[in-house]
Structures are given as C-alpha cells and as structure tokens.
C-alpha cells in the first residue's frame, strides 16, 4: 500500500502556486500536502510595512490555496518546535520547503533538517527563490565572485529552468490541524493610518504579479535600457515586492524577458542583467555573511561616522524635509506608495552616508 502520510509544505517567501518546486514535488507524490506558515522570530523582526505586506500576501495566498481544495495552516513559535508539533498531530513524515540564504535562515533550516532526519523523517529543501544557487557559481580558482560583471559573464549563457505549472489540485489530508486566525496576528497593527495610504499602490498576489509581468514585457521593456534610470518615467517592472515574497519567481521573469529578447527587443537583456544583480546580491550575502553587519571594506571601520539617528539632520532625512528636493521627493514616494525607484534609492542612501556621514547601519 502506498505511503499516504502527509507532507508538511513549510512556506516562507514562496507565496505562489506556479513555478513552486517544493509544492510541485509534494503534489507529485500523491500524498496529502499541508501548507503551513510559521510566525517565528524572523517574522517578528520585520518592520511595520513588510509585516503588513506579509499579512496581505498570506491572506491572498490562503484564498489561492482554497481554490485548489487546500488550506493555509498558521502557527506561531520556533520553527523546529512548531514542525515537531504538526508532525505529532498529523502523522506527517516529511517536510518540504524552499531555500532561503541569509545566515539566520540557513542556521534555522539546517537545524530543522538535522532534527527531522535524525528522527527518521524526510526533509527536503528546494530552489525557486534564485535562478543560480550561490554554490553553483564559482571563479576559475573555485572562489566566489566579488564583482558583478564577471558574475554576469559566468551565468549569462547558462540554462535557466523553465517555470513549473501550478498544480491542478493539492491533495488534502482527511483532517486539518488547528490553525491560528490570521487576524489575531495583527501583522498590520504598527502601520496604523499608513496602511490606508499605501494600500492603493500594492500589487497583491500571484495573478497580479504575472499580469504586471505580461504588461511590462508587452510594452515598457522595449525602452527599459533608456528609461529605467529616470525616476519620473514608468520604465521599471515594479515587481520587487512580489519577488521579495515569492508571489512571482525570477525564472518566470527571466523567461518572459528572454522571449522578448528572441523577438528582437534588445533592451530585454538589460532587464535580465538587473535580475542577475539580484542573484549577485544573494551570492555575496551567502559567501560573505558579515556584509549584513560589517563594512565591506575594513578601512571604513575607523571612520568617524555619525551613529546618532536622532540628530535634526537625520530626522529631516527620514521625514523628507532636507530641503534637497530630489531626496525629499524620494522619501515621500516611499511613504505614500511603499516603493522607491532604484535610482532614487541610490541618491537617498548617498545623501545619508556621504553627505550626512551617517553610518549605513
């Protein structure tokens, strides 16, 4: 008799149905799949806006799961403890998840995998958040890349996996485990009135992200190389929030751009290069995790930075009241729309660090 013990699908930054390798593999077994999202310390450490946006994404993804006869189980606590509880409650014998790459997530996931396998359970991690796993791209001497252009040259000719289709259905367990009600988590509480301001600009969920990608490839990508650095022009994809939560995959974006490139849209390659900048950032973080807490160049460690965020100058920067029109407009853009144009981010950060001499931390 085939194994019918459930598989726990541990969700994090992969709130989509299509091109979801972990979900695809779980459904392919024919066994019941229990999608679960855990509110642990990594979630609680998020700022007000990301936490609010996560809440919106979870609510929307729960509806998507319901459309395929599934549910989203919500639990709170340390991931290893919550997963152990769910295994005990459901009789699950496997945990599948999509890999993350920051040091905290790596340590957590490694501990979960070691514990699960030590108990005789199946524990499998899958790609999907990146096109090129950080350990698969190396210099000729076997080291990591530290400069973007050689990194781009190393990956530009590689085959990128074709996006996987969404499952037609998700096998459900006979009995669902207890779940928290999302509203009790109050993920948007700290946003207060800001939620009403930003909400109209949110591109929420997988369907909206895919629609925007199609719209972008059908139009703006043709002038992406010329318009992407002009903050006043609608020349970017606007998909950062969806990529961050995994409501769309980089593979989907890559292949849409590649199709445009094959149709003669030369500037599509510029967009593909920007997708690889994202890959490069993860590559650096994975191989040099100290970047999250230390200067890239040690010679800046003894620079007399201003580390007091309460100074009038820094507060004016935060509030968009520096008197420098571009900087202030960029900050207001972020507060109103939840986004800031890439070129504006560079200028705003430069003003803070190079003009006000404030430490980036």
Where on the chain are the PLM-derived regions?
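Helix-loop-helix junctions that connect adjacent transmembrane helices in secondary transporters/permeases
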Residues: 290-323
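Short, flexible loop/turn elements at secondary-structure junctions
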Residues: 13-15, 101, 127-130, 152, ...
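Active/binding-pocket-proximal capping segment
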Residues: 292, 298-303, 346-361
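Short, hydrophobic/aromatic alpha-helical segments in well-folded domains
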Residues: 22, 212, 238-239, 253-256, ...
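Trp/Phe/Arg-rich N-terminal binding region typifying the photolyase-homology
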Residues: 1-163, 267, 332-333
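C-terminal substrate/ligand-recognition segments
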Residues: 282, 287, 313-358
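Glycine/tryptophan-enriched, flexible segments
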Residues: 121, 142-300
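Secondary-structure transition/capping motifs at alpha-helix termini
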Residues: 118, 260-264, 337-340, 358-359
